[in-house]
Each structure stands twice: as structure tokens, then as C-alpha cells.
Amino acid sequence: MRYTSAAIETLIEEFAKLPGIGRKTAQRLAMHILHEPKSGAERLAGALIDIKEKVIRCSVCQNVTDRDADPCYICSSTGRDRSVICVVESPADVLAFEKTGHYKGQYHVLHGLVSPLDGIGPDDIRIHELLARLGERHEAVPVKEVVLALNPTVEGETTSLYITRLLKPFGISVTKIARGIPVGAELEFIDEATLSRAMEGRSAV
């Protein structure tokens, strides 16, 4: 069923394009916005514009950060262990590990996984930035370990194998988080206790 208002229908269609949002949920969101004060809609619109104009990728780890906070707060922190880098697929995975409160190293966000079937190769994700980072010799604390914390999927395993081969010449310890995370699961949806155990039980590859 389509609404008699073209504006409402357009908003529903835009909401329905978001991941995990079906038409019914999109309708509820649109109705909520419709009955909100105009100021609420303006704040939402402003937040949407801000995220496109003010959010960039950290020049060090490729995680998301504000344009006026680069490097990000994790890379800038003096309390993090700079000798360990945890490689993850997305910014959501960084949030998942940070919620555990267990991992105190740094991160590198790939923004994707190698997936030949989808036409995504190594050059399409942030692998070269990782290699460039490891090749920097002016770091006060050299990187001693790279932890591969990618989703337990075919794409995740393919990417892990590719990165492992590339890192061999660096002479750096390469480890993977422990098994125990369901195959095909996404790290951002795994509970904190399971992620903590996976990080604690990581093993060499």
C-alpha cells in the first residue's frame, strides 16, 4: 500500500534502503518523524548531513573519526599498546572489541574483505595502508604483533590468508583470534565475553 502523500512515500522508500529495515519498519519510522516537532526532524537532518561532511577515516588506522580529530582518539592515546595492531573489517568491529574493555592495543580497519565473487580484490580494501604503516621505521614503539580479527566467513579466511602472506617479510608475529565464534557470524553481534575469550586465546598462524 502506498501513501497518498508523495513526501511520506519517498521517506519510507529511503528508510527501507537502510540495512535491516523492511517496509513496515520504514513506515513506523516515517510516521514517527511525521508526528515529531519540526525541530526534531531538523536535528535528524542535521546529524545526517554532519556524518557526511565531518566524518573521515583516521590517517593512521582508517577507523572513522571527526575531521578535527585526526588521528583518532585511540591512535592518539598514550595509554594504548602500540606494539599490537588488531586488524578488523569495519568500524563496528572496533566498537565491539572496545566494549569488552579487554583489548588495549591499536587497530587497523580494512573497510571490507577480499571477495572475488563480488569483484572485491585486495586493492579495494585498506591492506596497502596497513603495509605502509608497518613499514614506517620512525615509530617510537615498533609493531611486534598483528592480530587478525576478521569474521569467520569464506571472505574473512581468504583475507586473513592473503594478509598473512604479505606480512611474512616484516618478521612480525601474526596471530588470529581463537575459534569459538560461530562460522558466518559477524563480530559486531558477538557478546563481549565471547570476544574477550577469543582475543585472549589468539594463536599464531
UniProtKB/Swiss-Prot annotation:
Q: Which InterPro entries match?
A: DNA_Rcmb_RecR (IPR000093), Rcmb_RecR (IPR023627), TOPRIM_dom (IPR006171), TOPRIM_RecR (IPR034137)
Is Magnesium there in the keyword field? no
Q: Name one GO molecular function term.
A: zinc ion binding
The segments annotated as C4-type zinc fingers are 58-75
Q: Which domain of life is it from?
A: Bacteria
Under SUPFAM superfamilies, the record lists: Recombination protein RecR (SSF111304)
Species of provenance: Chlorobium limicola (strain DSM 245 / NBRC 103803 / 6330)
Question: In what residue span(s) does the Toprim domain sit?
Answer: 83-182
Pfam families for this protein = RecR_C, RecR_HhH, Toprim_4
* Keyword entries, A-Z: DNA damage, DNA recombination, DNA repair, Metal-binding, Zinc, Zinc-finger
- UniProt-listed GO biological process terms: DNA recombination; DNA repair
| Reported function | May play a role in DNA repair. It seems to be involved in an RecBC-independent recombinational process of DNA repair. It may act with RecF and RecO.
Q: Which family does it belong to?
A: Belongs to the RecR family.
Fetch the Gene3D superfamilies from UniProt.
Answer: 3.30.60.80, 3.40.1360.10, 6.10.250.240, RecR Domain 1
> Under which name does UniProt file this protein?
Recombination protein RecR
**Per the record's keyword annotation, is Phosphoprotein included, yes or no?**
no
